[in-house]
Amino acid sequence: MAEASSDPGAEEREELLGPTAQWSVEDEEEAVHEQCQHERDRQLQAQDEEGGGHVPERPKQEMLLSLKPSEAPELDEDEGFGDWSQRPEQRQQHEGAQGALDSGEPPQCRSPEGEQEDRPGLHAYEKEDSDEVHLEELSLSKEGPGPEDTVQDNLGAAGAEEEQEEHQKCQQPRTPSPLVLEGTIEQSSPPLSPTTKLIDRTESLNRSIEKSNSVKKSQPDLPISKIDQWLEQYTQAIETAGRTPKLARQASIELPSMAVASTKSRWETGEVQAQSAAKTPSCKDIVAGDMSKKSLWEQKGGSKTSSTIKSTPSGKRYKFVATGHGKYEKVLVEGGPAP
């Protein structure tokens, strides 16, 4: 169980120490390279002094090799997340450099004489290529940093700014809430007597009342005049509804003629009603049709009798007399024969 618990801690440590080890390896490689370069420069200067003060210019390949190591760590850095297990050559170099540093011996660098022996034909065209080398140096010095370098610089600057902001936020003192302040004040202050508590309470109540009064004053006044008018109208409506409605007297209409005036006076006196009662027939068997026929007989009178009388060829005259409802009787008319 102890081994299982210690394994994850060791893995975490290895993950944390990975980038630091990578950075330390790169720093050591740069230091070794700089030492080798300084030794080469010293040996070249010593040879030049012995040879009569002529300073041979470094060949083009050496200049390019001297420029490459400064760019190599940035390209191989991979922002601290490279897998060093896939680079056995670099690991061997790192182990060799560490052994040299631990033993205290200076790092072994190839002498320029050996390089000249390996490359005997380089001095022949040193003078010819010197101008080209100077131009390339100037162009390389004038060229700005590559896009990868600028991206890495921007990322590094952004990360540094974010870290500074987080650090400032952590260092900023938090503003305590009013409840916490009240609690601290109450704890720091000595215990108050009941009279002081009552005084404080009354003062707070008075302040709240003053605030409420100020709010009420700021509110607009209600239209009291309109309310009074509405009350008056309401009371008047109640009074008029409670009273019994009086019949309005109609204006007298002028009667057009004297006949109407006489009938009016007769109605007022009651003569018309008496006359109508007297005119009503006593017999209840009479129908409206019979009454109309009776009126016709009365109006025409003798003309009807003359018309109903008929003469026969014998010279006698007869007439029909109504004996009942729809019944007539033939009666001989006394008198001489028809003319």
Curated annotation (Swiss-Prot):
Task: Give all Phosphothreonine modified positions.
Answer: T175
Which UniProt keyword terms apply here? Answer: Acetylation, Cell membrane, Membrane, Phosphoprotein
Bias (Basic and acidic residues) occurs at 32-43, 51-61, 117-140
Q: Cellular component GO terms, alphabetically?
A: actin cytoskeleton; extracellular exosome; membrane; plasma membrane
Instruction: Cite the record's tissue specificity text.
Output: Activated T-lymphocytes.
Record's compositionally biased regions (Low complexity): 300-315
Q: Name one GO biological process term.
A: cellular defense response
Per the record, residues carrying N6-acetyllysine are K327
Organism encoding this protein: Homo sapiens
What does the record say about PTM? Phosphorylated by casein kinase II, protein kinase C and MAPKAPK2. Phosphorylation by PKC induces translocation from membrane to cytoplasm. Phosphorylation by MAPKAPK2 may regulate neutrophil chemotaxis.
Its record classes its membrane topology as: Peripheral membrane protein
A Pfam family cross-referenced in the UniProt record is Caldesmon
- Quick one: where's region Disordered? 1-198, 294-315
Single GO MF annotation:
actin binding
Protein name per the record: Lymphocyte-specific protein 1
What does the record note on quaternary structure?
Answer: Binds actin.
Compositional bias (Polar residues) at which positions? 185-196
Q: Where in the cell is it found?
A: Cell membrane
Per its UniProt record, what InterPro entries does this chain match? Caldesmon_LSP, Lymphspecific
Where is the PTM Phosphoserine found along the chain? Answer: S24, S111, S177, S188, S189, S193, S252
Q: Gene that codes for this?
A: LSP1
The entry's function note states:
May play a role in mediating neutrophil activation and chemotaxis.
